[in-house]
């Protein structure tokens, strides 16, 4: 993992990294196990609720297996279910769907921990397993700062619990983002192993759910053009082969299948319209407050560390990607099934990655603060915002687990 995600502030070139120790391997395993035990348990129960997204996608997977008919252009979840069923790793399509979701939760936790370890493994304070485990848990658990009984549109969520394709997307989004950072902010030649992982992360994310890639691709393109104009170092070959070509090919195909009106190869057909606040305004009021409560930590950190944050390439890309995600959800809608609010997944996925990037950036700033300094007050404000997100997430998980216990 280290060779895939290694990067530094100024130049994301791969440093020489040791193998992770037993404590870090154990901590990553604990993060994955704890996350799957909580969120996996919630998802496991949701597979028994008739008519929700979990059941619908399992039915589409079975239809794909038996008839070859593709229901939606993002069909990776269905393919994985069918592969598990065909290989006799799951006795039913339902069990296959559950296992894929559990695996995606575990992989997301391991990837977040792995990124943090790559960055901080040389720091005696922040590179310890308990610290990285706590940081990983905070990123995974964080939710909008509100006391809610269940998922509701209006806030922006790191994990809305209710859609398996979004759960599958998140590890691909994390991998795709940090690999893009690695090649966008340094000039180097990618070996075939790293490039293959990059392609798989991008293609897998698009086929799981294209919501994140339609944000990352334009953001990365803008940053790349600006760096070319400024003659700043980047890796154009790796970016083109790992991100640009597979992303454009898959996204173009998905658009033609679902939105062009020219092909009937998939069951899902619709259009895209310019419709500011049509969706979010329909479901919620007080959108400005809900936005701020959903993004308090990612907002507080760059505001309080503005001089450093505005020059940090990772933060630039993360925020620009989230900007596109927010624009999609607040300004666009589908023309027919607009009430499905499918553009929310762009905002949710880009916010999740923004939380991860902000955690990396913030911990770097914490590591640089002298032990006795008034600057710790600034870090306490950031910690307070993060703690509020985490507490809200824990309370939300508690509510969901209580629902699971009652049913």
Task: Outline where the language-model segments fall.
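Start-transfer (signal-anchor) and selected internal transmembrane alpha helices
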Residues: 1-39, 125-133
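Transmembrane helical bundles and short interhelical boundary loops of multi-pass, membrane-embedded
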Residues: 247-252, 256-407
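Transmembrane signal-anchor helices characteristic of membrane glycosylation enzymes that use polyprenol
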Residues: 20-52, 108-110, 135-144, 203, ...
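Perimembrane helix-loop-helix junctions
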Residues: 15, 216-245, 273-275
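Short hydrophobic/aromatic helix or loop-helix immediately within or flanking a transmembrane segment
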Residues: 56-64, 68-98
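Transmembrane-helix motifs of polytopic, lipid-linked glycan transferases
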Residues: 99-125, 175
């Amino acid at each position: 993992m280290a060779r895939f995600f290694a990067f530094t502030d100024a130049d994301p070139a791969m440093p020489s990294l040791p193998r992770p120790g037993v404590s870090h391997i154990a901590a990553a395993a604990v993060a994955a196990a704890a996350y799957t035990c909580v969120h996996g348990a919630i998802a496991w129960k949701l597979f028994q609720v008739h008519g929700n997204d979990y059941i619908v996608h399992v039915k589409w997977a079975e239809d794909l297996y038996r008839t070859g008919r593709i229901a939606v252009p993002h069909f990776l979840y269905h393919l994985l279910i069918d592969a598990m069923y065909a290989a006799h790793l799951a006795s039913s399509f339902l069990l296959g769907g559950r296992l894929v979701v559990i695996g995606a939760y575990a992989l997301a936790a391991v990837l977040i921990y792995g990124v943090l370890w790559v960055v901080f493994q040389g720091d005696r304070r922040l590179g310890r397993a308990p610290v990285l485990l706590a940081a990983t848990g905070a990123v995974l658990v964080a939710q909008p700062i509100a006391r809610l009984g269940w998922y509701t549109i209006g806030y922006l969520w790191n994990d809305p619990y209710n859609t398996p394709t979004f759960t599958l997307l998140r590890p691909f989004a994390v991998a795709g983002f940090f690999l893009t950072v690695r090649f966008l902010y340094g000039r180097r030649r990618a070996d075939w192993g790293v490039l293959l992982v990059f392609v798989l992360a991008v293609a897998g994310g698009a086929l799981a759910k294209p919501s994140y890639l339609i944000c990352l691709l334009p953001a990365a393109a803008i940053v790349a053009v600006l760096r070319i104009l400024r003659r700043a170092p980047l890796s154009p070959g790796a970016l083109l082969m790992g991100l640009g070509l597979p992303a454009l090919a898959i996204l173009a195909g998905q658009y033609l299948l679902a939105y062009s009106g020219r092909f009937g190869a998939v069951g899902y057909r619709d259009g895209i319209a310019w419709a500011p606040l049509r969706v979010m305004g329909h479901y919620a009021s007080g959108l400005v407050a809900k936005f701020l409560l959903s993004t308090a930590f990612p907002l507080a950190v760059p505001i309080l560390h503005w001089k450093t944050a505005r020059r940090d390439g990772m933060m630039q890309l993360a925020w620009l990607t989230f900007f596109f995600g927010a624009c999609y959800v607040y300004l666009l809608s589908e023309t027919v099934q607009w009430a499905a609010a499918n553009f929310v997944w762009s905002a949710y996925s880009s916010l999740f990655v923004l939380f991860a990037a902000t955690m990396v950036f913030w911990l770097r700033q914490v590591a640089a603060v002298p032990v006795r300094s008034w600057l710790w007050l600034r870090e306490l404000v950031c910690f307070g915002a993060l703690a509020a997100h985490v507490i809200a997430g824990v309370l939300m998980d508690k509510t969901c687990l209580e629902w699971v216990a009652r049913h």
